[in-house]
From Swiss-Prot:
InterPro entries: Aa-tRNA-synt_II, aa-tRNA-synth_II, aa-tRNA-synth_II/BPL/LPL, Lys-tRNA-ligase_II, Lys-tRNA-ligase_II_N, Lys-tRNA-synth_II_C, NA-bd_OB-fold, NA-bd_OB_tRNA. This is Lysine--tRNA ligase. Homodimer. GO terms for molecular function: ATP binding; lysine-tRNA ligase activity; magnesium ion binding; tRNA binding. Belongs to the class-II aminoacyl-tRNA synthetase family. It catalyses: tRNA(Lys) + L-lysine + ATP = L-lysyl-tRNA(Lys) + AMP + diphosphate. It is found in: Cytoplasm.
Amino acid sequence: MSNAPEQKNPQNDPSPAVSLNDQMKRRFEERTHLAEAGINPYPYKFDVTTTSKAIIDSFSDENPADVSVAGRIMAIRRMGKASFLHIQDSEGRIQIYLKKDDVGEASYNTFKLLDIGDIVGVSGFTFKTKTGEISVHARQFELLAKSLRPIPIAKEKEVDGQKVIYDAFSDRELRYRQRYVDLIVNPEVRGTFIKRTKIVALMRNYFASNGWLEVETPILQPIYGGAAARPFTTHHNALDMQLYLRIANELYLKRLIVGGFDGVFEFAKDFRNEGIDRFHNPEFTQVELYVAYKDYIWMMELVEDLLHKACVEVNGKDSTMFLGNEINLKPPFRRLTIADSIREYTGMEIRGKSEAQLRDIAKDLGLELDPKISSGKIIDEIFGEFVEPKLIQPTFITDYPEEMSPLAKKHRSEPGLVERFELIVGGKEVCNSFSELNDPVIQRERLEEQARLRQRGDDEAMIVDEDFLRALEYGMPPCAGLGIGIDRMVMLLTGQDSIRDVIFFPHMKPE
């Protein structure tokens, strides 16, 4: 990639040929001319038989193939009675050779009214040019869609002995707002989203191959729960009731375990009415998995295996680059309790400390805390500020205080703790897991304590869900649960530094 200075606006070009408005005006006129000539600028179909990649991969000098291919014009070189153009389809680019004598005068005249960005269909045969480029010699040529806006193809000019890039579509905010253009002109962006699809497909197949059932649960919920977060609210007119967009699907999936399924999972859109930054989007994708008769230790091994397989699938190796660090995802991952991690990175011991003592520790570390937050939140603040950013290689942080995890089963050997882990990679949480709490009496006590925290001003504390408690009272088997943020996982495995680079259409402020 060139290190030349970039000028993002075409008006910055030292000698622009025409303004953007003039370009669009000319394209509208070309559309009119095509229609007047009896040519539909937007026909209904074209029979495609192959792709650019398939043509190149299967090319043979001895056996030229008849092909029909379609794509967007990305470059044109006109030479009187013959022309070359490059078209781009979903798999790459291929050169087209267009000769007036072969396609006919009418088609060639149509071609003269075309621009970069127009979508065309070509039927012909494969050949290799004198320079060795595999190409398609056109016998038939058809316009499939007229582009009325110019595609921002990057160009270079030399100014005062220095290369200047202009018309490049590289402004991040503009790329996010007009992802459709971003995908056209930046092939690496398209590659990231193809990898995302592969990652999700691998995970879905991994879960299904174990016999677990993919399910769907409500997005609109009368009571939100399953995570500590603020919800989006809406109103159901017919029932005259307030509903919430789900913040997690945990409580409904556990109901299905009660109902007799041994394993269920769901790829879900969840919604949290919170801030937007490099790692958070209000609408995000996560997968949750619940497996009966398992615990969080078993789930750690599953996560190690799953992440390693996904990394090899998209990168062809055990490691990935993330936020400037090479991350090795070959199992086993390091395991560290949250108390041990805080002691290792701050020198402070949090075990057995009261809320007042934890506040003193936070103060000694230089943290300013909201006076309304409780012990669990204080520990979470200390961990998030002084420990999490330093955990670069994959690390399971385990055994959290009970207050931090009201839906997790109490630790089998450590009083006051629960069986929970978070996987931290590159200084960021990737997934969260519990040995799930299935004692309905203790679960009620935990949720009622959450209600008291809400009264103290914690608007992220959970609400008592009576129907969920009723389900537990019928009996839920021992169960391990897992939640993986798909967007974070894709960031990790594709080396992206912003969640907006792995979501097709991230939330943006109004233009």
